[in-house]
UniProtKB/Swiss-Prot annotation:
TM regions (residue ranges): 2-22, 26-46, 92-112, 128-148
Any Gene Ontology CC annotation: membrane
Record carries keyword Cytoplasm: no
Descriptive protein name: Uncharacterized protein L282
Length: 152
């Protein structure tokens, strides 16, 4: 059940996925779809860290799917960087002037760091579940906001 909770917390990905689809930006659509599916599967079978039980796959399989999740994150950063550069060049003014985006990015990434702190200590599993679910909601919300207000 714990794995399912963290896996389902990827649901907010439908916002940036839907927006990129409506804007006919199929590369971004594919990138966000990839990371959200990889994250969903990774968290569903996760049993190699955080004391999560998984759903019966080996720890090696859990680790490999976690690497797919990380790959999706890297691809997403690359894609969003490309979109930003194409629209704004090297200036950071649109980000710095957008106080909401600037202010929300910091706590969202703090949630990620807190959720991944001491990932091999099963006593921190509850903290991991809560903060990682909040990370998913936050990062996909930021993706949507960034696409809608900075890129498109």
């Amino acid at each position: 059940m714990e794995n399912l909770i963290v896996a389902i917390s990827n649901f907010p990905a439908v916002l940036p996925i839907g927006l990129s689809f409506l804007k006919r930006d199929f590369i971004t659509f594919g990138t966000i779809t990839f990371v959200s599916i990889a994250s969903f599967i990774s968290h569903l079978i996760e049993n190699h860290k955080h004391g999560m039980p998984g759903i019966g796959f080996s720890q090696q399989t859990s680790y490999i799917w976690n690497r797919f999740d990380v790959l999706g994150c890297i691809l997403s950063v690359a894609r969003f960087s490309y979109l930003y550069y194409n629209r704004h060049g090297l200036t950071v003014v649109p980000i710095v002037n957008n106080k909401w985006l600037f202010a929300m990015t910091i706590p969202v990434f703090i949630l990620l760091r807190v959720s991944e702190y001491d990932k091999y200590n099963p006593n921190l599993k509850t903290r991991y579940i809560i903060t990682h679910c909040m990370w998913h909601a936050g990062i996909f919300g930021l993706m949507y906001y960034f696409l809608k207000n900075i890129v498109y």
